[in-house]
Regions:
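Hydrophobic transmembrane alpha-helices and immediately adjacent juxtamembrane helices
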Residues: 1-165, 169
Length: 172
């Protein structure tokens, strides 16, 4: 495995993300809307019932963690499918690039995509709802690491199922 090839593929996807304002807006907009929506729903429940007093923090934390898992899996899948849809796979395999190098570059790019959506969501929860996810400390890092690995694994599983079910459509 060559680092230069992995870095080149990473840069290709990174430039596709950063040079397109709609892509960046999509990565930031939906997590922010989800946090705002679940925050206000949680506040409504907490203000109308004593049973849900501590639900705001739990629901917002779960929404952020779920969104990170979802963004990681979707980010990995979309990057791979964009290679297929743009008919770039032939070009990739003409070059001396191995499957492992492609997957590693997609893994790192999926992390960047997930972080672009995660950071604004975490920053919104503190001023709007008084919930800080960073209070979990080092446990938060390990939780995000596990969610990230599960999201990538889920992405690989979904892509393999897509490839098994429709191998001829992906190639054309």
């Amino acid at each position: 495995m060559k680092f230069n090839r992995i870095y080149g593929l990473f840069l290709r996807h990174f430039f596709l993300i950063t040079r397109s304002f709609p892509r960046i807006l999509d990565l930031i907009y939906w997590p922010s809307i989800q946090i705002t929506l679940w925050g206000f729903i949680s506040n409504f429940f907490a203000s109308h019932s004593t049973y849900y007093n501590n639900a705001v923090g739990v629901i917002l934390t779960c929404a952020i963690l779920y969104d990170f898992l979802f963004r990681t899996s979707i980010g990995f899948n979309m990057l791979f499918l964009e290679e297929i849809w743009s008919r770039n796979f032939t070009n990739l395999f003409i070059a001396p690039i191995k499957i492992g190098e492609i997957i590693i570059s997609l893994v790192f790019t999926a992390l960047i995509r997930a972080l672009i959506g995660l950071i604004p969501a975490i920053l919104l929860t503190s001023p709007l709802f008084g919930i800080s996810l960073l209070d979990l400390g080092i446990y938060l890092f390990f939780l995000f690491l596990n969610l990230y690995m599960f999201g990538i694994t889920l992405g690989i599983l979904v892509l393999s199922l897509i490839h098994i079910s429709e191998p001829t459509r992906l190639a054309t």
